[in-house]
Structure formats: C-alpha cells, structure tokens
Amino acid sequence: FVHWYVGEGMEEGEFSEAREDLAALEKDYEEVGIETAEAEGEEEGYGEEL
C-alpha cells in the first residue's frame, strides 16, 4: 500500500514517523491505564484500614 501513497506525493519517512508516534501514544495510554488502576486500588483500600 505504501507505493500508492508515495505515488501521490507522500514520503516514505512519514510512515516511519507515524508508526513511531502511534507506538509512543500507545505507551502513554498504557501508562495512564496502569496509574488509574493503581489509584483506584488505593482508594478502595483506604476505607478498609479504619
């Protein structure tokens, strides 16, 4: 499929850059999900200690 986009004027480097950007975005979402799950776990455990 890349050759179609290159034929329309895109550069191949743009695909690599987009792939890296998506990988970074996915990693950010995973980190936020982990932090959110940890924060929810702390909130649930807070009331049990009293």
Swiss-Prot record:
InterPro entries, sorted: Tub_FtsZ_C, Tubulin, Tubulin_C
What binding partners and quaternary form does the record give? Dimer of alpha and beta chains. A typical microtubule is a hollow water-filled tube with an outer diameter of 25 nm and an inner diameter of 15 nM. Alpha-beta heterodimers associate head-to-tail to form protofilaments running lengthwise along the microtubule wall with the beta-tubulin subunit facing the microtubule plus end conferring a structural polarity. Microtubules usually have 13 protofilaments but different protofilament numbers can be found in some organisms and specialized cells.
EC main class here is hydrolase
Enumerate the UniProt keywords alphabetically.
Answer: Cytoplasm, Cytoskeleton, GTP-binding, Hydrolase, Microtubule, Nucleotide-binding
Question: Which Enzyme Commission numbers does its entry carry?
Answer: 3.6.5.-
One GO cellular-component annotation of the UniProt record comes to: cytoplasm
Alphabetically, which GO biological process terms does the record hold?
microtubule-based process
Q: Where in the cell is it found?
A: Cytoplasm, Cytoskeleton
Per its record, what are the GO molecular function terms?
Answer: GTP binding; hydrolase activity
**Name of the protein this chain belongs to:** Tubulin alpha chain
Taxonomic source organism: Blepharisma japonicum
Q: What reactions does this protein catalyze?
A: GTP + H2O = GDP + phosphate + H(+)
Q: What does this gene product do? A: Tubulin is the major constituent of microtubules, a cylinder consisting of laterally associated linear protofilaments composed of alpha- and beta-tubulin heterodimers. Microtubules grow by the addition of GTP-tubulin dimers to the microtubule end, where a stabilizing cap forms. Below the cap, tubulin dimers are in GDP-bound state, owing to GTPase activity of alpha-tubulin.
Q: Which family does it belong to?
A: Belongs to the tubulin family.
Cofactor dependence = Mg(2+)
